[in-house]
Amino acid sequence: MKPLSSPLQQYWQTIVERLPEPLAEESLSAQAKSVLTFSDFVQDSISAHPEWLTELESQPPQADEWQHYVAWLQEALINVSDEAGLMRELRLFRRRIMVRIAWAQTLALVTEESILQQLSYLAETLIVAARDWLYDACCREWGTPCNAQGEAQPLLILGMGKLGGGELNFSSDIDLIFAWPEHGCTQGGRWELDNAQFFTRMGQRLIKVLDQPTQDGFVYRVDMRLRPFGESGPLVLSFAALEDYYQEQGRDWERYAMVKARIMGDSEGVYANELRAMLRPFVFRRYIDFSVIQSLRNMKGMIAREVRRRGLTDNIKLGAGGIREIEFIVQVFQLIRGGREPSLQSRSLLPTLSVIAALHLLSENDAEQLRVAYLFLRRLENLLQSINDEQTQTLPSDELNRARLAWAMDFADWPQLTGALTAHMTNVRRVFNELIGDDESETQEESLSEQWRELWQDALQEDDTTPVLAHLSEDDRKQVLTLIADFRKELDKRTIGPRGRQVLDHLMPHLLSDVCAREDAAVTLLRITALLAGIVTRTTYLELLSEFPAALKHLISLCAASPMIASQLARYPLLLDELLDPNTLYQPTATDAYRDELRQYLLRVPEDDEEQQLEALRQFKQAQLLRIAAADIAGTLPVMKVSDHLTWLAEAMIDAVVQQAWVQMVARYGKPNHLNEREGRGFAVVGYGKLGGWELGYSSDLDLIFLHDCPMDAMTDGEREIDGRQFYLRLAQRIMHLFSTRTSSGILYEVDARLRPSGAAGMLVTSTEAFADYQKNEAWTWEHQALVRARVVYGDPQLTAHFDAVRREIMTLPREGKTLQTEVREMREKMRAHLGNKHRDRFDIKADEGGITDIEFITQYLVLRYAHEKPKLTRWSDNVRILELLAQNDIMEEQEAMALTRAYTTLRDELHHLALQELPGHVPEDCFTAERELVRASWQKWLVEE
């Protein structure tokens, strides 16, 4: 055994002073001293359980001892009689065995392959034991789940990722999917439960037993987000539901994940074989599947963006040449050829890599380099995590942990270790890059004239610029030269580093040649240099623009078209990744797919990391906003569709924010107990104004009110019990907080909740009964006008139906026409006096006479005036469809309705484009005169004349 290095010997002296009496220094072997010095986790564990050290010394860890885990655990559980006892014994067993594995790993008593096998089989043993104990307990409590033939139905558990592949790392989440074979009901219990209910409840208890922290720690962090439909899907699915999902909706990333899926426990039973046979055609296609190449390219891009997003420069898993790239290389061949080559259908990486070499899909040299690199990286990863039983793949920055790793990896010092690490990761990155090329072969770098380089290097006199800037006016030419000079002066103030300078010197001649070819070169260059000034110290973004000419061209065209987009990219350079793929850049997400896209995006972020969750929500919104704006600029989205996309995006955000707030509140207080006998959350979010009317703009805030149907006597069922209505108040406050918290990516949305009953003086969240009573007995006419543009944007079906009924009832109340006309007109006049344009030579598109607000007031007045006679007028909340309804119900002539619709969409379109130009919403007085006259005439007809 290698002696401890000098820094570790010094550290050992500090440990001796802390050791409990049973671990006196003179009684410890050299092996024990080495392991205790290396791992704080082992040190803490053995200090708490000195008998474990005796066991380690008398029965040292063996490579094949995983075969005894089941028997050892059964013995530990033999006297367990309740769930608390089960949780305690599982946690102690896991800790005891992990200490043995850490001991064997630190001292290199067994191979790294054996360590991975032991870690994986330990997890499987604990999962299966917990499942089987709980299954028996649940059957005693609720009866045995059976199919139509009366045959007992088991819970099958798919272990995904490294758990499925038998390659679990030392401190790891476990990704699981739960399934049961056939529908049916329980038999033999006090009451009958549907199988879905039985397995859902059992699954929830299983997750709690494994995942919930106690004074003994936890067993494993359980991640269920890889199941069909993710967080929004059922916790447990029948075989039939699984098959339907993967046949009809399974995506390439799910094929990628399913390659390693393994059934935990009895993997050779009838049901296990049935499940495996059902999934195989989805994962492994019968033909050689080169169609997967594009998906794999996309995944490669996702890896690169993840590395940039999180700054993972020292990450041995996700960084360039890291563990994930080796896994990716192997799975490329499995996904492409696995259907035709059964030998490639292994879940484990190293055996599959051997098959790949045997089939000559990789050279023997490349395969061997990958094998050696993989074992090196996995040992380094497991050692790193075993120091403190911590889930990390980032190399340490402190001297102690660096000394620990260098010693355990058998290197003299840290520089020697990092040198070997760099060599391995370089080999991996080379194979990775060779395997997955770009869509098109790289074109040769366009030869730039020496003058463009000299222009950037400030080596040209003004007279020398004529050839390259000949098409520009003299003023523009001078402005371009000034901008370049100012940008270079700005760079001199920054700490860029030699690599950044090199990339910038390569990028700028390309950029200048493209920008200066434009007639609007000066204004475009102004916007782009402002953007570049914000990212010059972040070389990865400069490299992105330098290495992907298409991304640079998109950047130039978008910045030229819209200062708003230029500002967004400057504030949030992470959005530059969106420029890589024009197929998504100019093609916004389908309106009904935002929720699913957001769910997939959030899968990358730890569920319990609120800061990263907030950041991810904002980054997703900004990326989607960029796509919508790009499509708007390109002319592929008309104004109505722009608002549709912005509205659907906002609704997806509301859905995710409510979900996060709900999970956080329930974790703290439990659920209100009136929900125990029903589905849903008893909560709704109502959108007013532009959100309610499907008319959001690029910078619109959200007008929201919150409703609940919680009885007065309801309480929460958690350890910290609170009043049910107090729970919903805190939920609404939490939602407001999640929307408004400012992170490095800004806020999510400005939220205005003042349209709630009694405005800012009222409760933030209102019961459905109180809302209905307020609308009937206290609300002003303007509040009923606002209700015309209101709809539920998140909520249980029963609350949605209740709100719709209240809205319909209020809007269909009989109203005296003259009184209503006066109240609506006077409210509009007050608004115009307060909000109207103060510049006599300008027209405020929204607030001035003949503008958008006049059209909105006309439609609201007519709905409130005539809905009593024509209830169908209450159906929609947006102005365009309300105008259609007014024509269809003979309130307004069709010609007038169509003319108002055209005026409305024309003015809205102009507002969108002004927003893209970061200009205020007013135009010269002589603009839109025809539309304004039309609106004035309609206003006069409906709201002035008797």
From Swiss-Prot:
An example molecular function term from Gene Ontology annotations: [glutamate-ammonia-ligase] adenylyltransferase activity
Co-factor requirement: Mg(2+)
EC class name: transferase
Pfam families in the cross-refs: GlnD_UR_UTase, GlnE
Translocase is among the record's keywords: no
Renumbered residue ranges of the record's region Adenylyl transferase: 449-946
Entry GO terms, CC: cytosol
Keywords: ATP-binding, Magnesium, Multifunctional enzyme, Nucleotide-binding, Nucleotidyltransferase, Transferase
Catalytic activity annotation: [glutamine synthetase]-O(4)-(5'-adenylyl)-L-tyrosine + phosphate = [glutamine synthetase]-L-tyrosine + ADP; [glutamine synthetase]-L-tyrosine + ATP = [glutamine synthetase]-O(4)-(5'-adenylyl)-L-tyrosine + diphosphate
SUPFAM superfamilies on file: Nucleotidyltransferase (SSF81301), Nucleotidyltransferase substrate binding subunit/domain (SSF81593)
Keyword Glycoprotein applies: no
Protein name as it appears in the record: Bifunctional glutamine synthetase adenylyltransferase/adenylyl-removing enzyme
